[in-house]
Design a protein with these regions (language model features):
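Feature responds to low-complexity, polar/acidic, surface-exposed segments characteristic
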Residues: 1-7, 11-35, 42-62, 71-135
Length: 135
């Protein structure tokens, strides 16, 4: 699935229309332009530092999880909002841009909502044995 296709799926969960205030240099004329712009306006997606979105590139796990978490307003602010006993993944380190998103999506937890809309984890829930999916 491409970044444009995934952005279109996510944007359809919102009934608003794009006002064109958030655009990218490489989406002019693209079939998903309005969806991409709407998802960006909602803060669900951001492009790359060069001002592009790369709509036809395949979406990565990290990008998809980040979009979903933002769409569901499930976002910890920094690693101190997590719990040390959480599941961790060998391909996801605290310095990675997607670390918080992956941890958020793969650890069932209770949380307290902070005033700035971020969340702080208050406890972990029993998780399935994720390691059975490795290899």
């Amino acid at each position: 699935i491409t970044r444009a296709q995934f952005a279109a799926i996510c944007a359809r969960f919102d009934t608003g229309k794009s006002n064109g205030s958030r655009t990218f240099s490489d989406i002019k004329g693209h079939w998903a332009k309005a969806y991409i712009e709407r998802a960006a306006e909602l803060g669900w997606i951001s492009g790359f530092q060069d001002g592009t979105f790369r709509p036809d590139a395949y979406i990565t796990r990290a990008q998809a999880v980040t979009m979903i978490n933002r769409m569901l307003n499930r976002v910890p602010e920094d690693p101190s909002d997590l719990l040390p006993s959480m599941n961790v993944w060998p391909d996801c380190s605290p310095g990675d841009w997607f670390y918080l998103a992956i941890q958020e999506a793969t650890n069932s937890h209770d949380y307290r909502r902070k005033a700035n809309s971020y969340e702080t984890w208050t406890g972990l829930n029993a998780d399935p044995d994720w390691t059975r999916y490795e290899n």
